[in-house]
């Protein structure tokens, strides 16, 4: 989702989701 706008967010989003 946010990874589309912020590639760096993908790392934070994945952690919070707890998924890859």
Curated annotation (Swiss-Prot):
One of its GO terms (molecular function) is rRNA binding. The keyword Signal does not apply. Part of the 50S ribosomal subunit. Zn(2+) binds at residues 16, 18. Keywords: Metal-binding, Ribonucleoprotein, Ribosomal protein, RNA-binding, rRNA-binding, Zinc. One of its GO terms (cellular component) is ribonucleoprotein complex. This is Large ribosomal subunit protein bL31. It comes from Ectopseudomonas mendocina (Pseudomonas mendocina). Binds the 23S rRNA. Disulfide bonds: none annotated. The gene is rpmE. Its cofactor is Zn(2+). Belongs to the bacterial ribosomal protein bL31 family. Type A subfamily. Binds 1 zinc ion per subunit.
């Amino acid at each position: 989702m946010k990874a589309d706008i912020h590639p760096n967010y993908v790392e934070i989003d994945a952690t919070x989701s707890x998924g890859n």
